[in-house]
């Protein structure tokens, strides 16, 4: 009898538990193009700190180079601008306009304008990309890679040279944008929009 009572209690408990409505889980809303969305976000952040760096550093430091073996501050900005055309022309399936900014521009105003123009050219590649179109294969540096890989390579290149510029800025006692809490708060607010 005791075993029967325990069995009835267990069955009743199970029935009550199973009869309850399952908790409603809120599933995350899937983003239509999660890979390109993240790549675009990463690019946008790199672009923001690069432009802020170019604007923040005084023109007198544009010719600064820590050693003779490396590019000057201004040459790095020109190189990054040239690279925007290189990477993004491949991603867009266009001929590289190759403006040769690194070799032809040296003033702060000219380099900032060139950098803004180069980023505007690249913006179109990032904005027009989807996860599907990003999987299309293209040739880059002799390798067949997906278009999205080209844009990821561009992001990596921006980050690499931003790292160079951070060192140059620190050598001149300038706080880089990524270490400026007010600037980073501003960036985070724009990302959340």
Predicted segments, located by residue:
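Bacterial Sec-dependent N-terminal signal peptides
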Residues: 1-26
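Short N-terminal segments immediately surrounding and downstream of signal-peptide cleavage
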Residues: 21-44
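Short, contiguous alpha-helical
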Residues: 40-44, 48-51, 61-99, 140-193
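Well-ordered alpha-helical scaffold segments within catalytic/enzyme domains
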Residues: 49, 53-54, 88, 118-126
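Surface-exposed helix-capping loop/turn segments at secondary-structure junctions
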Residues: 56-62, 126-135, 171-177
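Polybasic, low-complexity association/targeting segments
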Residues: 98-106
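Acidic/histidine-rich alpha-helical segments that form the ligand environment
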Residues: 106-139, 145-161
């Amino acid at each position: 009898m005791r075993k029967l009572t325990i069995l009835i209690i267990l069955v009743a408990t199970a029935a009550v538990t199973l009869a309850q409505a399952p908790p409603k889980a809120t599933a995350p809303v899937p983003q239509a193009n999660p890979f390109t969305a993240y790549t675009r976000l990463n690019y946008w952040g790199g672009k923001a700190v690069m432009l802020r760096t170019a604007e923040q550093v005084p023109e007198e430091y544009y010719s600064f180079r820590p050693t003779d073996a490396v590019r000057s501050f201004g040459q790095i900005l020109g190189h990054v601008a040239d690279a925007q055309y290189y990477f993004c022309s491949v991603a867009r399936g266009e001929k590289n306009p190759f403006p040769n900014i690194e070799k032809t521009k040296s003033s702060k105003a000219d380099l900032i304008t060139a950098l803004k123009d180069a980023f505007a050219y690249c913006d179109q590649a990032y904005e027009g990309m989807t996860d599907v179109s990003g999987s299309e294969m293209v040739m880059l540096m002799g390798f067949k890679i997906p278009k999205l890989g080209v844009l990821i390579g561009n992001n990596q290149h921006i980050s690499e040279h931003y790292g160079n510029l951070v060192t140059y800025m620190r050598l001149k006692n300038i706080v880089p944008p990524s270490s400026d809490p007010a600037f980073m708060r501003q960036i985070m607010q724009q990302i959340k929009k």
